[in-house]
Each structure stands twice: as structure tokens, then as C-alpha cells.
Amino acid sequence: MQLPKVVLLLCAAALLLSGAVRGCGPGRVVGRRRRPTKLSPLSYKQFSPNVPEKTLGASGRYEGKISRNSERFKELTPNYNPDIIFKDEEITGADRLMTQRCKDRLNSLAISVMNQWPGVKLRVTEGWDEDGHHFEESLHYEGRAVDITTSDRDRNKYGMLARLAVEAGFDWVYYESKAHIHCSVKSEHSAAAKTGGCFPGEALATLESGEKIPVSQLSPGLRVLAMDNSGRPTYSDFLSFLDHSPKEEHMFQVIKTQDPHRRLFLTPAHLIFVSDNYSTPASEFQAVFASSVRPGQYILVSNVVGLIPAKVRSVNTQTNYGAYAPLTQHGTLVVDDVVVSCFALVQKQRLAQIVYWPLRVLYNLGIIAGTQPSQQMGIHWYSKALYHLGRLILHGNEFHPLGIVQLES
């Protein structure tokens, strides 16, 4: 992170602070119109995000072919957007059928194409496939994928078309062929489409009294076990929830350790402190995405003597209900006896702690009240605003793809 980026984010945070003092919400920032972000085209055979299509970090697993006679056919909706040209080789209208998520992304992309190249429209060459023309388990069979070009079929535009598709919110974009761009989305009910940076509601936090309570029951005024900048255990004020979604199903990483045994559920985009060596001081453990933790690495856990390294035995995924992301004064927290960050989405713990400083000031001064669980649903407005500001300053690759899905859907 270069210093100017930090300064810009701090300035953005200061703007949010002044807006919050005036109206308890992000509002509209008045000032000069921002310069458009410079976009870089995708290269031939490049895909984004840089993971396989049918994985958690992209469009998710194949869920089965949809036919006109199947129950799931009702999940498909026709797209009659006049700004999109559908090739419709089959003359059945099949290419117009797609899931709502795919339709929303495609309509957004159509606007971007017209803005990028006046007089040019988006063209769909393949949408839902009912005839079996694609490879086995293709997302075309579920209406979750489209192959696209520009209406003028200028192949020099296709790299930028792919980039525009990424920006439009497609969950996976592939410069698959010199003749088209392939785009796909998550299923409508996929838990993978609902992953911010959180813990399940039954995960336990440790109070200053020694009592352990579910994170869902945290409230302002409580002090919870955390880690300070020196890597020592401390008790930190709970301020608010950065995410509070008690009823939604989410996908969690399940990290298990040995010597001592611990088990932690957290979403893939959340930060956790990791080292490759047992002898690394606690203060030098690095904050990384939970999705990048591997067996054999070490994470920090709490026991009677303090915070110690524990070797990761296994990492897998599991769905669970409820998602809570507590914010503390120190930006860290001990959940289920494992040290974790309060932050997610960007793999920069120190930067996150800095840009959340204005929000902590608001709570400490009593200008805004701490969040009671019943008062907030979903992602905190400050987190959403910081995310959108960060997208103007940081490179897209610095964001976890699943966090982007959560904040842009």
C-alpha cells in the first residue's frame, strides 16, 4: 500500500465522518465529479477472478440441467432488453432465458457497452442451452452463463468487453475464444453468493468477566478478549456490528487445529492471523483471508497462559445460518478461542484499522450509538461506503471476490 492511497482513504473516511455527524448516514458527498477509473482489458485466455469457474470464489458448483419441463424452469426469466442483440440461432428464444442474477448483470453490461462505444450494442451469441451443445455440466444448461460479443463484432474490443463484464458484476468472466467472451453467475439460492466477513451467531466471544457468550448477543458496553498491537491479550470495547444477518445462510471456512484443539467458523473473505512458523512472535503473524489458510500453517489461539500458536490440521467449507461481524476498539477479537481480525474483504489489517478510526471516534464520543442486534440488519453503512470509495483507489485484485459479491449484490 503506497502512502498516497492511505492518505486518500483517510480523507475519504474524514468525509464520511463529517457526513455521519450531519445525518447518521453516508449521504451524498458534494464536490468535484470523480475521474472515471481507467480500466485494463483482459488478455486472451485470461479469466477473472483467477480461480476455476465452478468454485466457491467464482460462480459456484453446477446444480443440474434445466429443461422446459423441469421444476427449476421457473427460475429462468426472458430478457427483452432492446439494447441487447440476441443471436437466437435456434429461433426458440432460448438465448433470452436466464436467471435473474444473470439478467441483472447483462443489463448493466449493456449500458456500459453503449457508454464505452457509442453506437455499439451488446450481442449475446449463446444463453440458456436446452439442446446439449455445450460440455458436460456447463452453466449454460442452467441459464447462468452467456457468451457475448459487440454488435459490430470488432475483435479488438473483446478484451475491454471482458473487463466491462467484470465491472458489471458477473461472477466469472473468461476471454475464452477470439470469437466471444464467456460470462457466468452464481445460482440464485447459492450460499456462496452470501459471503461477507463474519462468524455464525453461535460462535463464542470471551467477556472480561471470563464468561463466554454468543457473538450474536454482544452489545455496546461489553468488553471482549482481543489482541493488541504487541500481540498480547487484552480486553477491548465492543462498538457495533459491521455485518448483522441472523437469518441468511452463508458459506463458512471451517479451520481446525491441533495442540491445542480448536475449531473456528468464519467466512472466506474474513481476515485471520497466520504464520508458517511456530516460532513467529504473535505480533508478527500476518492477517490473511480465511480462504487462503492451509493445513500446516499456524494460527493464534488463547489458553490459560495467553496467546499461543496452534498448527492447522484441516480446512474445509460448510454452510451455516446467521452472520455477525463485531467491531472492537482494537480491530481484533478472540472467537471460539482463536484470534481473528474484525475486518474482511481487503488483506490489509493495519489500513483497515486506520480507515475505521473515524467510526470508532463517533462511537467513543457518543455521536452515534453502538448497535444493538435488533437495530441493524445487513452490512453497516460505513463499511459499504468505504468499500465503494476503496474501489476507486485500490486495484480490483486487492479485494476478495466473494466480498465483492456480497457488497455489490
Swiss-Prot record:
GO terms for biological process: cell fate specification; cell-cell signaling; positive regulation of smoothened signaling pathway; protein autoprocessing; regulation of gene expression; self proteolysis; smoothened signaling pathway. One of its GO terms (molecular function) is calcium ion binding. It holds the Pfam family HH_signal. Ca(2+) 1 binds at residues 89-90, 95, 125-126. Keywords: Autocatalytic cleavage, Calcium, Cell membrane, Developmental protein, Endoplasmic reticulum, Golgi apparatus, Hydrolase, Lipoprotein, Membrane, Metal-binding, Palmitate, Protease, Secreted, Signal, Transferase, Zinc. GO terms for cellular component: endoplasmic reticulum membrane; extracellular space; Golgi membrane; plasma membrane. The record marks 267 as: Involved in auto-cleavage. Residues 1-23 form the signal peptide. Induction: By activin. A lipid is attached at residue 24 (N-palmitoyl cysteine). Expressed in the marginal zone at early gastrulation. At stage 14, expression begins in the neural plate with expression becoming more prominent in the anterodorsal area at neural tube closure. At this stage, also expressed diffusely in the somitic and pre-somitic mesoderm. By the early tadpole (stages 28-30), expression is widespread throughout anterior structures with highest levels in the otic vesicle, the eye, and the branchial arches. Ca(2+) 2 binds at residues 90, 126, 129, 131. The keyword Cell membrane applies. Signal involved in the early induction and patterning of anterodorsal ectoderm, nervous system and somites. Induces ectopic cement gland formation in embryos. It is involved in the regulation of endochondral skeleton formation, and the development of retinal pigment epithelium (RPE), photoreceptors and periocular tissues. Interacts with BOC and CDON. Interacts with PTCH1. Interacts with glypican GPC3. PANTHER family: HEDGEHOG, INDIAN HEDGEHOG PROTEIN. This is Indian hedgehog protein. It comes from Xenopus laevis (African clawed frog). The gene is ihh.
